[in-house]
Amino acid sequence: MTESLFFAPHDLPARWRRTRVFTFVDMTFSAFLPLWQRWRDDEERCDRLHVVAIATLKALDDPPSTDDASPLAAELARAWPMRVAGMHRLEFDEGRVVLTLAIGDDAQAMLSKLWLRADAFHLEATDDPRALCKSLARFAGDGATVCANASGPLHLPMRRALESSGFECSSAAADARLVARFAPRWRVRRHEPPLPCAASAREAVVIGAGLAGCAVSARLAGRGWHVTLIDRHALPARDASGNPAGVFHPIVWRDDSVAARLTRAGFLYALRRWQALEDAHHDLLRSPAGLLQIADTPEDATALAAAIARFAYPSEYVQPTTRADASRIAGVDVARGGWFFPRGGAISPAAVCTAQLADAAARITLRMETDVTRIAHDGRIWSAFDTSGGEIASAPVMVLANAHDAARLAGLYGAPTRSVRGQLTVLDSSALDALRAPVIGEGYAVPLGADGALIGATYDIDDPDRDIREAGHLENIERVAGMLPDLALAPKQIRAGRVAFRCVTSDRMPMIGQLADESAARRDAPQLSGAWPLDLPRMPGLYGAFAFGSRGLVWATLAAELIASQIEGEPWLIERELADAVDPARFLLRALRHGEIGST
């Protein structure tokens, strides 16, 4: 039965033997385990198997039983995600088998939000087959197969919808199951689904060895790429990524905004990647006690408690807290209630960078203490050049992950990034010795054990001063006093300080993805006045991961996986709407739509 359901209609395993990556879209939420087992049993299997399973939130209520005799089912159960909407990427067999769960209120609507190139679809017919089949045609690769259970009155409408969308049906008219292959005789879509970057070799240059660059290097190396990682410092994680600790948590707000959905995706994916590093015996210096966020006002606390209930977030994701509850969690009196993230906390950014590079060391070459003054493309290869004009490294793919300098190297329209100075303060260990968990709100306070306590941070826009200022320390103390009013912090408890510079955009979203070809866009500006992101010309092989602001820990792993997926032509791990919100070309796109640039 399983053989006929998941393999024979799609000519598996023969078809995945002819490709490096095979993508199977499953709308029945039942194909993953049989496919994984068959892939494991096949010595001629593809390098990577992607299964994208689409379902409603209710599907997460029933994880595979840990009592199941199948070891694969038990492994899937251990990796089962939290019960929250959105996309969850689970990785098995050293990342060679990937399950992306796309969870929404309506499975068919969720399908339309994805961005991928599918080799096979497995689904049930619906009472709106035209919309469903248009989505299938939007994502179908050459020769993609469809197997649909379409019995009774659903059969003929489904067959007609498939045929009108460019599929050839091979099933007999009386069959309950429709089998079809994508073979359009006319153009059935505006944009082609994603293809791998046309690289002559699986080699990349990454500029910047902070959280962004180390994460990108690791995700590419994990796919078999050889990466040259360049940084101006002697060691990785020296700028903002060199802070003693950083806090990590998603945004939760009254509506499930783009920012809330993006930070949720980044937070959950980061937890998985960090756990994989810790399972490989890397110490990330991650705090175990969760993270407490203090509301700005009592009204905000009340509104957020209502939103948490309305979205039915599980308690392992976020919990509303009264002032009394929050004080108990923190171990000290807090000013107001708020919300608690049991899986949030603090972590060492430098330890994360070190672990990622160590885990992928065989495929990463470091070029430290090296300044990149310009980059160039000869139509095939990207090259990075030093201050004397010498070539540092070259490769078909380049990723700019060097914060403020990325926009300069790429020559992005309108200088879309700004620098924000942040000064943090390290206090004596006695200052916050009663604090049990990191607390954020107007500022942040992170217990560091014997290393003291970290508080901060100032937010000084366009301030280039690298010197530590007494006024900055006092501002940080004042911020913490507003959250933790019973603590009597004093300047004499200051042990040290540090200044780093955040890179931010005007919309406070990061820049993640392939960069636009701005010269071509300027030349074709009249034709692009009504463009969408997929309409824009792109720089072949050039990507960006920068402008992470204060959320580098949440953005970095998400950015790395999204960029690696774009380079490899794999399914994206977030909805296309969310990817558009962080697209580095979004400012150019707005300017084109508003007629602000032309062919002058």
Spans of model-derived segments:
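Helix-loop-beta segment of a Rossmann-like dinucleotide-binding subdomain
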Residues: 70, 254, 283-293, 317-359, ...
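A short glycine-rich, Lys/Arg-flanked "PGG" loop and its adjoining helix->strand segment in the class I
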Residues: 130-142
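C-terminal catalytic lobe of FAD-dependent flavoproteins
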Residues: 490-600
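Active-site substrate-recognition segment that forms the wall
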Residues: 177-178, 187-223, 232-233, 237-252, ...
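Helical element adjacent to the flavin cofactor pocket in flavoenzyme catalytic cores
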Residues: 339-388, 392-397, 401, 406
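Short beta-strand to alpha-helix junction loop
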Residues: 147-149, 258-266, 294-300, 339-358, ...
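S-adenosyl-L-methionine
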Residues: 64-112
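Dinucleotide-binding Rossmann-like beta1-alpha1 core, especially the glycine-rich loop
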Residues: 246-329
